[in-house]
From Swiss-Prot:
UniProt-recorded name of the protein: Putative antitoxin VapB1
Keywords: Toxin-antitoxin system
Function: Possibly the antitoxin component of a type II toxin-antitoxin (TA) system. Its cognate toxin is VapC1 (Potential).
Native source organism of the sequence: Methanocaldococcus jannaschii (strain ATCC 43067 / DSM 2661 / JAL-1 / JCM 10045 / NBRC 100440)
Highest taxon listed in the record's lineage: Archaea
Length: 64
């Protein structure tokens, strides 16, 4: 689990995009995608060796 006090690092990535693409929207989409991929990879690491079907069934029961 990542605590609020965890240290972070900042990186800068530069993209060359066509003029007809909204730069702010593109930047937001890239941020969203990177966060999704990082969280997905972390989830896969946490679930390694777990019974996925059992977890899915438990989630379904909680939603009912």
């Amino acid at each position: 689990m990542i605590s609020a006090k965890s240290k972070t690092k900042r990186i800068t990535i530069t993209f060359e995009i066509p003029e007809d693409i909204d730069a702010k929207k593109f930047k937001d989409d890239v941020k969203r995608y990177v966060r999704y991929k990082l969280l997905a990879n972390k989830l896969y690491e946490l679930l390694e060796g777990e019974n996925i079907e059992e977890i899915e069934e438990e989630i379904r029961k909680r939603r009912e």
